[in-house]
Amino acid sequence: MDSRGVREGMGANGGCKGDLRAVECKTMAEGTGLRPIVVELRMPFLPEAGGNGVPGMLDPRMVDGHAYVEALTREVLASASDYADCQVRAVALTGGMAAHVADDALGALLRDVRQNFNLAPGAEIALRARPGMVAAASVDAFRIGHVSRIVMDYATSSLKEWRALGRVLDPGAMDVTRMVLGALSECGHGVRLAGREADLAFELLVGIPGQTPTSARESVEAAFAYGASEVRLGDCRPAANLAVPASATACTPSAEEAEQVRAAMQEALAAAGFAEYFPGCWALPGHESPYEVLVAAGTTETLGFGLGARTLFDGVEARNTSDLFTYLHFSDDPEKCVAAVHRVG
């Protein structure tokens, strides 16, 4: 079926993403049981002005976060009933920062996901946050939504490196965030939310201007001190990570220097009992991210919601509009919200 046929099929049967799934999806009636899926809720917010110039990212000071999350909720509710024969293995809020944008609406959204989808026992619910941008209302949303993994976009513990990144709040803001999140769990890492233990992951960057093996190890050790049960190592990309790339070019590490930095971080992680379960993802035993594992395996279908979100079932991909106005007003109308449908592979 060509992309036009898929889109017409979606509109003819109530206009839900579930109709795209129904084109080829094996169902319980065919004896396959519940089909495993992951759900991605796209939260494309960055606190830097203009989304730091990253295409598709939104500045929460310029865009009404509540209006966006409400549109996201409408899209979710419009599709949920079509996935009764599927089991959600993981829910991830992707694309940017989810915390401190519209916390009350976020908690309600995650509650709606739990109530309207069939979640597997122990299904992961993961979101991203920034140091200093987790309020008491954020923690309430985490509790309501049964968040089980908080990924801190920490980047570095070095003030010098932080300045090159142009972040809004310096790394010391993590001290406040750690207090807001509450005491460490009994095992010495992660947090406790309404009596449930949640993992605390830290994203660190490799190749920041001015970064050295010593400063990199200090960033890893800072993550340990804050209670990290997982650490993710990502590459610093000037277009996406640096506020003033031109002025930082002179002290940007060479490829060889960046590998030395990475090796120092990996050595520190291994010495602390962390193991690499996926390239760049290190975790203590038993604290690996189910979402990352499922996505890496490539065997689980993906249901995406939000601005520019991607849904993939049986080699048929649908992409939502990247136009904010269209999404805010027509998120529950696939004829207008879905921008493209095509086969992949």
Set out the residue ranges of the language-model regions:
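Flexible, acidic/Gly-rich N-terminal and inter-domain linker regions that tether
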Residues: 1-48, 52-53, 99
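Detector for the c-type heme attachment site
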Residues: 54-59
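C-terminal scaffold of the Radical SAM
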Residues: 34-36, 62-82, 86-345
